[in-house]
Amino acid sequence: MEMKTKVLANDGEQHLLISRVFDLPLELLFKAYAEPDLVSQWMGTVVKKMDNRVHGSFEFETTDPKGNKMQFHGTIHTWVPDRQIVRTFEFVGMPFGVQLEQLDFSALPDGRSSLRIQSVFQSVAQRDQQLKLPFAFGLSMAHNRLEQILQPK
Amino acid sequence: MNTRRDVFQAIADPSRRAILLLLATVPSMTAGAIAANFDSARPTISKHLQILTACKLLNQQTSGREVHYQINATHMKQVADFIEPFRALWEQRFNKLESVMKKYKSR
């Protein structure tokens, strides 16, 4: 299967790039980022605050399957509908620091659209830590499944 | 030597994955501290550490009589499996965005 989402993280750099082509017109793609109700649906998070303007800010609260609450917040620096969002992003209480995110939205010829996210971390170590998290999580999932299988019935 | 294949063999073993998981959350650990997390005999864990080090998934540092191990993040990133869960997470999220917006459009 074709990989629609691409991630580029070069060694020793403190940023990463995420890019994706959507089978959606540009206006709908941007709307998915602009409307709290829609953000809530696709991110699977509670949107506690979302003030989409320069100097505005956002606050999300997500509950993991174990019931732990996780907070995310940031400040908006640039908000150009259908074009660009520049904002800070912080996973509260995690050692990843504050990220500077630049989201570039663009239209593609056949009614599709693309999104390119550049995320700059405060250090290479923090970026690597963030990249490692789903890997570690995946490992622990594999480990848990293994434990379930091996568990005497 | 086919290093790439070796790396995948290395992470195919559940004990070695568990060692990598353990080390993913700390800067470094001694062989003894790693072994203390497992029921397996110390020589078994040493063997796993040797394999992981040979595949460049771990770095070894000797200070005095203790050998410290840490994840070799540089090499791990070259292993598709390392970055793949992160990519898959975003793929999943964006697929959801696409389906939410397709429903929204047809409303």
Predicted regions and their residues:
Chain A
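Hydrophobic/aromatic beta-strand elements that line small-molecule binding cavities or substrate pockets
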Residues: 20, 48, 72-78, 89, ...
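Intrinsic-disorder/low-complexity, polar/charged segments enriched in Ser/Thr/Lys/Arg/Asp/Glu/Gln
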Residues: 13-19, 57, 71, 84, ...
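A short, structured loop/turn motif at beta-sheet edges
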Residues: 26, 77-83, 104-114
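Beta-strand/loop substructures that line and gate deep hydrophobic ligand-binding cavities in soluble
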Residues: 93-137
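Hydrophobic pocket/interface hotspot
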Residues: 29-33, 39, 58-60, 76, ...
